[in-house]
Amino acid sequence: MAYSFVIDVPRRVVFSRIWGTLTDEQAVSHAKTLKDDPRFDSGFNQIIDLRELANLQMTSPGTKNLAHIVPFRPDAKRAFLVGTGEAEKLSKVLWTYTEAGVDQYTLFRDLPSAMEFVGLDAKTPWPDRAPDQTFGS
């Protein structure tokens, strides 16, 4: 798996991308790396782009663990941008384990809708600057 993120402090949004294969360890690493970044605020919203997630290798215990260490506050809006059954499955399981409501945690199939959900204009593009962190290949 590879993942990257951009912390957009002025807009209070984290833009995350995950592609390839995702394991328990990699998902936990992403959450911990975000939490440890001094620019990160747990009240930020997030768009997580999972459209290129090809292979989900997370276990049920690993997913439960991830749900408990999610660095975002329960009232933060998290838009999951999905394109495959694997990404949708992960999103729905996390949604269940975190006990989040649809006001905080929603699946989208298009970027403009996800942007609007986190409070940005629908025409806002994905950040074109280099990611703050990139892991994997």
PLM feature segments, named:
Residues M1-S137:
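Amphipathic, Lys/Arg-enriched alpha-helical "gate/interface" segment within cytosolic domains
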